[in-house]
UniProtKB/Swiss-Prot annotation:
This is Taste receptor type 1 member 2. Coiled coil: none annotated. Belongs to the G-protein coupled receptor 3 family. TAS1R subfamily. Keywords: Cell membrane, G-protein coupled receptor, Glycoprotein, Membrane, Receptor, Sensory transduction, Signal, Taste, Transducer, Transmembrane, Transmembrane helix. It is found in: Cell membrane. It comes from Rattus norvegicus (Rat).
Length: 843
């Protein structure tokens, strides 16, 4: 025997064991004959602890429990909708709808009504192989109001695909159409209720809350959904969560329950949280709020779930206004014309009883106190806007529109025929109509995307006791604020419920304890910033080219600095470079015009041009030091200038060496001197030194890089120093060391030739040039080891220009002076006389 067969056998057995239908009560609100019957499940009475009778097989007597005003109000909404449809000529013309309604007394009476609706008129449930042609007692069921009851009834009705539309059960479990294929509802699911609550708390910046739940499926499931939702954001934390004790039906709490409740209230009094979210049926809260009043709580914000958000009995405890502000999530307010008058009407319409139905009664189809109790609450029910009433009203109309399509109705008549539940279910899934200005349809999960309202309790009965302050759309998942809230606080200020106050901009959070909402605020230091959307608990470092001040939330571009033309040091160096360029050009012209004269030949002859050309090019390339550095300018700084300078130094050094050889070594080592001159020793030496310098430069560039970079100014982090790569400094120091060696050699050879003939004695000029080069190079190395930034660039450029000026003016300047102003000394005879004089002194 399969699972379905076993279920059917069990249901059939229960139908035989449970009480049989009773005698028809003609003037009962629970019955109305019609061509097609709708079943209605409502909670007219409720037992807080509903498990006491489940240990034995007996249907409870609901009228022995506490009456629920809202339950009776919702049952009247179904009666009103059916009668309105029966009086409508455009919807189901010629067809009368009937109803059978049962009091399920919350959780106590679920199975029996389901079986009652499921059975045929003879109270039998035959075991069939195919139930597609089976006609139960009703074609559809409206209700019940809570998720636990709805799931129980749906587990019975879904086997037979009997449409069931609940008007208040919000459990997300009901969205699973594999287990509940015939379940639909006219309210949004619990997920949307939770989302509306969370957005409400986020809007008012409440991040420290208390959650109180009932000890049942409703409390556990909703608190679980809230916890899941809060894990997606660290904006809201739960200070603590407690389970409320459920008293017996007498509402008298036992000592154990009283101690449990006292512990909860004591924690609530000691906590800094001032927002309390309560997921519980309203019957479990009467004792709780009486205790809240006894403890004299004030200044709290109570957020009600939909189960008690508009409960008139709780609202009737007017002293609750002193405990704080009451907010709740409920279905949108839609006024139904004529319903308020219908609710307190006692007479029934005189519809003829069709022969197609056989009315009977079952247990819990009476409520003697309902009408009088409802009248006493009539004013508050009218002012509240009949919120959940519209959910029942629209559920009946959804069935009516589906039946209208199924029967092929036109404007004047319908084709009455047998209607099987599965046929009606198919049509209900596709209904799409407008009712009192609202477009109604069911989505893929069987939910009707109705708007939710955030309401506030008011105790001025001249106004709506459940004033709407905001609206939530399940479609857009956004909360729209429409009214200001009247806070029950001094000066009408928004209550504060925060474990820690919000950090100021640019302050990061440092967690204190286990809750992310409890933290201390720390300033973000300069060079860091806080991006709250990315990480509120860590200050992020600014990129290398950017900077920030203390407590900044963004970084800004550092101010780039480099050598610019308008700066005084640049202007001074540019003037010196221009002086060097034009003086070198003049020297080059003078030496070219007097190339054959003894003065030019004694200065080096062709080798002079080997020195002057690099000097001229070097002075012309000085502008590469100015402006933002580039790969080309860094290459010139690291390679071009040092090679030019090395060529000049090597030429001076070899010229000094050659003069000493002529006058002091030629006689002693004639063969060596002959070899030196025969194989162009001077040019070989210059080429050799140049090759070494080029090799050093190329090796340094290959080992490092010449790409320019931006570096932070150590004295001012707001400034970005644009310069060549730091390895450029290392290469510069290395190259300067080689130049120092050449300077020392040139100075030594010049000193050795200090006693030579006057026209060949260049010791003082070379000494001047080499000493200046040596001193400036030492100064540059010392300066670079101490300073950084643009100053190094300026110093490097200044030393480079001065070194070239020292060579150009210090070495060639005196010779040009002699050529231009003492031409008589620039003759072969004069030079020969000087050599003869030197020879005679040495002999």
């Amino acid at each position: 025997m399969g699972p379905q067969a076993r279920t059917l056998c069990l249901l059939s057995l229960l139908l035989h064991v449970l009480p049989k239908p009773g005698k028809l009560v003609e003037n009962s609100d629970f019955h109305l004959a019609g061509d097609y019957l709708l079943g209605g499940l409502f909670t007219l009475h409720a037992n807080v602890k509903s498990i006491s009778h489940l240990s034995y097989l007996q249907v409870p007597k609901c009228n022995e429990f506490t009456m629920k005003v809202l339950g009776y109000n919702l049952m009247q909404a179904m009666r009103f909708a059916v009668e309105e449809i029966n009086n409508c000529s455009s919807l189901l013309p010629g067809v009368l709808l009937g109803y059978e309604m049962v009091d399920v007394c919350y959780l106590s009476n679920n199975i029996h009504p389901g079986l009652y609706f499921l059975a045929q008129d003879d109270d039998l449930l035959p075991i069939l192989k195919d139930y597609s042609q089976y006609m139960p007692h009703v074609v559809a069921v409206i209700g019940p109001d809570n998720s636990e009851s709805a799931i129980t009834v749906s587990n019975i009705l879904s086997h037979f695909l009997i449409p069931q539309i609940t008007y208040s059960a919000i459990s997300d479990k009901l969205r699973d159409k594999r287990h509940f294929p015939s379940m639909l509802r006219t309210v949004p699911s619990a997920t949307h209720h939770i989302e509306a609550m969370v957005q409400l708390m986020v809007h008012f910046q409440w991040n420290w809350i208390v959650v109180l739940v009932s000890d049942d499926d409703y409390g556990r499931e909703n608190s679980h959904l809230l916890s899941q939702r809060l894990t997606k954001t660290s904006d809201i934390c739960i200070a603590f969560q407690e389970v409320l004790p459920i008293p017996e039906s007498s509402q008298v709490m036992r000592s154990e329950e009283q101690r449990q409740l006292d512990n909860i209230l004591d924690k609530l009094r000691r906590t800094s949280a001032r927002v309390v979210v309560v997921f519980s049926p309203e019957l479990s809260l009467y004792s709780f709020f009486h205790e809240v009043l006894r403890w004299n709580f004030t200044g709290f914000v109570w957020i009600a779930s939909e189960s008690w958000a508009i409960d008139p009995v709780l609202h009737n405890l007017t002293e609750l206004r002193h405990t704080g502000t009451f907010l709740g999530v409920t279905i949108q307010r839609v006024s139904i014309p004529g319903f308020s008058q219908f609710r307190v009407r006692r007479d029934k319409p005189g519809y003829p009883v069709p022969n197609t139905t056989n009315l009977r009664t079952t247990c819990n189809q009476d409520c003697d106190a309902c009408l009088n109790t409802t009248k006493s609450f009539n004013n508050i029910l009218i002012l509240s806007g009949e919120r959940v009433v519209y959910s029942v009203y629209s559920a009946v109309y959804a069935v009516a529109h589906a039946l209208h399509r199924l029967l092929g109705c036109n404007r004047v008549r319908c084709t009455k025929q047998k209607v099987y539940p599965w046929q009606l279910l198919r049509e209900i899934w596709h209904v799409n109509f407008t009712l009192l200005g609202n477009r109604l349809f069911f989505d893929q999960q069987g939910d009707m995307p109705m708007l939710l309202d955030i309401i506030q309790w008011q105790w001025d009965l001249s106004q709506n006791p459940f004033q709407s302050i905001a609206s939530y759309s399940p479609t857009s998942k956004r909360l729209t604020y429409i009214n200001n809230v009247s806070w029950y606080t001094p000066n009408n200020t928004v209550p504060v419920s925060m474990c820690s106050k919000s950090c100021q901009p640019g302050q990061m959070k440092k967690s204190v304890g286990l809750h992310p909402c409890c933290f201390e605020c720390l300033d973000c230091m300069p060079g860091t910033y806080l991006n709250r959307s990315a990480d509120e608990f860590n200050c992020l470092s600014c990129p290398g080219s950017m900077w920030s001040y203390k407590n900044d939330i963004t970084c800004f571009q550092r101010r780039p600095t480099f050598l610019e033309w308008h700066e005084v040091p640049t202007i001074v160096v540019a003037i010196l470079a221009a002086l060097g360029f034009f003086s070198t050009l003049a020297i080059l012209f003078i030496f070219w015009r007097h190339f054959q004269t003894p003065m030019v030949r004694s200065a080096g002859g062709p080798m002079c041009f080997l020195m002057l050309v690099p000097l001229l090019l070097a002075f012309g390339m000085v502008p590469v030091y100015v402006g933002p550095p580039t790969v080309f300018s860094c290459f010139c700084r690291q390679a071009f200038f040092t090679v030019c300078f090395s060529i000049c130094l090597s030429c001076i050094t070899v010229r000094s060496f050659q003069i000493v050889c002529v006058f002091k070594m030629a006689r002693r080592l004639p063969s060596a001197y002959s070899f030196w001159m025969r194989y162009h020793g001077p040019y070989v030496f210059v080429a050799f030194i140049t090759a070494i310098k080029v090799a050093l430069v190329v090796g340094n560039m290959l080992a490092t890089t010449i790409n320019p970079i931006g570096r932070t100014d150590p004295d001012d982090p707001n400034i970005m120093i644009l310069s060549c790569h730091p390895n450029y400094r290392n290469g510069l120091l290395f190259n300067t060391s080689m130049d120092l060696l050449l300077s020392v050699l040139g100075f030594s050879f010049a000193y050795m030739g200090k006693e030579l003939p006057t026209n060949y004695n260049e010791a003082k000029f070379i000494t001047l040039s080499m000493t200046f080069s040596f001193t400036s190079s030492i100064s540059l190395c010392t300066f670079m080891s101490v300073h950084d930034g643009v100053l190094v660039t300026i110093m490097d450029l200044l030393v480079t220009v001065l070194n070239f000026l020292a060579i150009g003016l210090g070495y060639f300047g005196p010779k040009c002076y002699m050529i231009l102003f003492y031409p008589e000394r620039n003759t072969s005879a004069y030079f020969n006389s000087m050599i003869q004089g030197y020879t005679m002194r040495k002999s």
